[in-house]
A protein has these predicted regions:
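Outer-membrane beta-barrel domain signature, strongest for Gram-negative TonB-dependent receptors
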Residues: 1-72
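Signature of Gram-negative outer-membrane beta-barrel scaffolds
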Residues: 35, 61-211
Length: 211
């Protein structure tokens, strides 16, 4: 390829088409060994945010809010072009090289294989290889109390929430048929800050503070 020889710097489309076109099965149909795939990322996202402020007197102020995010994204690929063939078989060609004697291990859709006794036969537009959802839930509540009593000022803040993420597989692969563990994180944070105007320095500081 460093000498810019075309057969190394470009795909040999004629060869790909010829391999598929001449690869006949027992029924006289052409089984594609090479295809063009389309990798898809289909995303759904909902975000909400609220903010409230309550000040019954000039000495006391309460603020708070909530944020919520839900995201569900599907990752999959589908057949875009059979390159001269009639169909494609939904198996892992790399696994077939190493585990050819174990039909279950080479399946991209293990449940389909168990149900039908054979690998899935695909046409243009069919999903194959992998298909799963990535789910994210992020919920946060926060609040702040502010006291202003002449020379004495105080702030109390608290934040809590839940962050959850997990993968939802839509097919089971023969090499890795098990389930993934869910991820879940509980968020909590708080801070207390008091000041006295005579000195202008904090006399109490607990938790995280940007002041």
């Amino acid at each position: 390829w460093q000498q810019n020889i075309p057969q190394y710097t470009h795909l040999n489309w004629d060869r790909l088409y010829n391999v598929n076109y001449n690869n006949f099965d027992a029924n006289g149909l052409r089984r594609s060994k090479y295809v063009i795939e389309e990798r898809r990322v289909d995303q759904n996202d909902v975000s909400l945010s609220t903010h409230v402020k309550y000040q019954p007197t000039k000495f006391f102020t309460l603020t708070g809010g909530m944020t919520f995010r839900w995201n569900k994204t599907e990752y999959y690929k589908q057949i875009d072009d059979l390159l001269g063939g009639d169909y494609y078989v939904n198996i892992d060609s790399f696994a077939e090289r190493d585990f050819a004697s174990n039909a279950a291990m080479i399946q991209n859709d293990l449940d389909y294989y168990f149900k039908h006794g054979a690998a899935q036969v695909l046409s243009v537009g069919d999903k194959y290889g992998y298909d799963y959802y990535a789910n994210v839930f992020d919920e946060t509540l926060w609040g702040n109390i502010k006291l202003d009593l002449g020379g004495f000022k105080a702030n109390l803040s608290v934040k809590g929430g839940l962050n959850e993420f997990y993968r939802e597989g839509l097919v089971r692969k023969g090499l890795f048929p098990g389930l993934d563990e869910d991820g879940k994180e509980i968020i909590f944070d708080g801070k207390v800050l008091t000041t006295y105007d005579a000195a202008g320095k904090p006399i109490t500081s607990l938790g995280k503070s940007d002041i």
